[in-house]
């Protein structure tokens, strides 16, 4: 563009344009104070207390359990708890069936790839009352797989929620497809977006592909 402009000026030295860029008047608006959303259903502290009644091993993700930690949470922020692999399925079943929690809706199942483990995260919700919870499960990566085969291998597995929530069928297949995490007890565990022979798992940090444009700097 700059080269074309310079060429035009060279050929038309006396040309003058009447065009003037439009100046936009900047509007100012009064500052609006943040209004916290009204709490829906059970509070994070109430939910945590119910979960801890039968599962003493649960803990808050990234926080120490304290009144101050719960008080600092926004009312519409889902409770985020760490649960063991052994308790993951039974805790989800408990939260779904307990009349106080009634977490009958599975919003999502997703994962995060860390250096030596995956975080598997299931988000549940009570469709009647509105409270939500993240069940976060830490899955160590299988270190018995040779380095040269790891990028194209299943590195972790977890119990499937598909018998509890029909929606878990496709959501877990997506995690399997993108992260290479297997789900025990899933009746149709196969790739959902990519071909069965696709090499690797695109949302993992070890994924490589010849068409990936690397970022420099």
Question: What name fits each language-model region?
Answer:
Residues 1-217:
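Terminal low-complexity/charged segments
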């Amino acid at each position: 563009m700059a080269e074309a402009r310079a060429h035009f000026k060279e050929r038309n030295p006396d040309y003058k344009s009447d065009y003037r860029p439009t100046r936009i008047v900047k509007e100012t608006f009064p500052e609006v104070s943040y209004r916290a959303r009204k709490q829906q259903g059970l509070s994070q502290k109430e939910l945590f207390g119910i979960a801890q009644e039968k599962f003493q091993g649960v803990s808050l993700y990234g926080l120490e359990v304290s009144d101050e930690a719960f008080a600092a949470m926004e009312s519409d922020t889902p409770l985020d708890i760490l649960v063991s692999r052994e308790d993951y399925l039974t805790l989800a079943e408990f939260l779904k069936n307990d009349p106080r929690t009634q977490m009958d809706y599975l919003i999502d199942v997703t994962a995060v790839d860390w250096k030596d483990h995956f975080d598997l995260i299931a988000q549940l919700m009570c469709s009647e009352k509105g409270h939500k919870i993240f069940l976060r499960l830490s899955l160590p990566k299988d270190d018995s797989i040779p380095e040269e085969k790891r990028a194209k291998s299943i590195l972790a597995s977890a119990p499937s929620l598909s018998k509890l929530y029909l929606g878990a069928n496709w959501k877990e297949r997506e995690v399997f497809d993108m992260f290479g995490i297997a789900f025990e007890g899933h009746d149709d565990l196969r790739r959902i977006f990519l071909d069965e022979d696709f090499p690797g798992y695109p949302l993992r940090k070890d994924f490589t592909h010849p068409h990936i444009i690397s970022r420099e700097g």
